[in-house]
């Protein structure tokens, strides 16, 4: 087995010693904070749980009182000026949960003030009114309900709203996504039999507040463990509210949380308590994984926390959760990793037996959706096993799952246990760096083929590059302390990887600036990044991340060698030459050298993937065309524009668009070199195109495109049959693409129309070229059947692949971003996107023609400048320079209208979405603009150099 990845040595011995002392202090304080009965917890206070604890009444000697009046006062102190509680920029759902629960608590206290006499009814009424107004405002713009990470939201929010409606004596709260919430509620409830909750432990026990009045809480007392319902203060509070028999153990638990939690008696209640196993494993693993050595931080604290984990795994039969009796794969895997780092390894076999699924590991026994970070934690724990080969199947499974997740993630990778995309990004960089290290050393080389290694390398490269590209000027990432730590830890790990040799100075600069910001950052600034029912911070864990980031950033790093076995990371000579060409374009001339080189390297990972599909549709080697050098260029056009605009579209979308670009070039060549000559009679080729498209639409079973129908061509030659098969393969690859079939019927219809027009335009172009080639003069097209305006808006424009590619992209957005809904739903949006498509297509044709004048003249192909509108002006013949100047002016005119159409589309999309305009509305516009940027880049490149293969 190859040696471990060395962290390096401190640049400054005194600074290093300071961090070591701080790390040992953290370990000691965490261990000493551990209570032998109630455990350990440094999670921040949460309004949601505080509100539920504030609603617990208790009757003593026939006198009813609020059990925790300090919680009520905490709610008064934390209400914002706009009437809300818990508003966060990263999640709307948490604010709705906090505000709804706090308003409910105030309503309960307003109806029965009991012993709390220092708040007037007028003040209470005003606070409740402001709270309800805020809640309605939040519900009206709620757009992350389907994407929410928060536990039990499908149960909790409907229950809260129902309780509020009853207390306020008002009809139902109406808001745009209510039907979505109700559907989610029904689907989730369908997975549970409430009667079974009385027997076996169930995840519902974590959210009993959603089942007040629906369950007999007196039958749930046996589920209490050390006074809590699954370590949830809000669920435990609901149990005390709903049970007819008082439970002293539950009261004692909540009193301990009140006194010893993050609120320290001020009324604030932690959202989860305890988090013993979570904190022990995260603190140890975070400190030892990349920053500190075991020798540096060994002591009573480290040994004590390690012992807690060992005993928990022993007592709970090999699988643990964040707290006792809450088993999950996350905490189990992290504990295994932590213990391996302190040289006390525990077998992962039971974890595998309990949590391994068909294609990934589940966090719990059942869950609505899988977790990327859970699988990365499993992978990291397995990579530390001494008998690595025994776990090859699971390593392969989790690596493949992670690659697929990254491949399909649009903009930022997302996970349900952490609100920041930087957390799963950091874990991916850590895990895949380790995977590459083991591949280089031969330990895992047999597991992954070249394509798989390519995707592993691509994932790391993109993860790190996007972290670099999104760093703020002050050195932080959005001003968040813990998230900045995640970013630094990922970048520090990347310094070991050879892919980043060309940009090591930039990478180190990012680390240094992050280090400086982090050192000056106050420990009191909270970063509520972890998710449960709402969002919270874990104090000791946040401190561990800060120390690990500071320590690792201060270490000298040996030469980067990891990843040397991934040859696709080395750009080809064609790409190197291409960079000089791209430098001349208006889009990329302002870019720093490192940024351009980074996109070139990222592009190189896509080239082998494209090469593997190079002849999947069209035969190449016997066609009389030049070598397809554009294959190595295509990936950059998409990657470069994607990085330049910081759009970060998914690899799934990027690759499909790259492949479509490749097919666009190949179709152009194939129709000219093969299909046209084979058919001879172009009317027959027109009929064949219609037949192929109609058959593809009517019969999805023809997806492999290898069997052609004999109808209509009873005596056709084998070559005609082969052409029909080839065109069927192409048509299937576009119209029967998996995501196209999952898109809206309207977007599919648009694609079919544009695709049919594109294919027929090729044949019409062949006819035009044939007539043009028979002319005595090649200077002007003497027999056009349309004016130039008509031609460029029909055959000329449709002949380039822009319009149908645009429609294809809209189908991908419909399927993947919008759950099969129309990409552009209103009639106005549909018109405007068609306008964008048309102007982009016309520009593409004009600039393409501008760049290919010499080739078109040589091959006698019709070019824009051959039309009479360019050859003559006021009866005077125009020379070549004059024609080119006029063509550029018209192209500039089209550019202006494209820009205006894009602006109008953006305004209309915002107006149609109203207050609920959310991330998906913005994303689709970003992707449309990215498509237009790529079109613009091709246009600029055509002006500099003709990119098409020449016909021999």
Curated annotation (Swiss-Prot):
The keyword Lyase applies. The gene is cps. Its EC number is 4.2.3.19, 5.5.1.13. This is Ent-kaur-16-ene synthase. Mg(2+) 1 binds at residues 668, 672. Mg(2+) 2 binds at residues 668, 672. Belongs to the terpene synthase family. A motif (DEXXE motif) lies at residues 668-672. GO terms for molecular function: ent-copalyl diphosphate synthase activity; ent-kaurene synthase activity; magnesium ion binding. Keywords: Isomerase, Lyase, Magnesium, Metal-binding. It catalyses: ent-copalyl diphosphate = ent-kaur-16-ene + diphosphate; (2E,6E,10E)-geranylgeranyl diphosphate = ent-copalyl diphosphate. Its cofactor is Mg(2+). SUPFAM superfamilies: Terpenoid cyclases/Protein prenyltransferases. Pathway: Plant hormone biosynthesis; gibberellin biosynthesis. The keyword Metal-binding applies. InterPro entries: Ent-kaurene_synthase_fun, Terpene_synthase-like, Terpenoid_cyclase/PrenylTrfase. It comes from the Eukaryota.
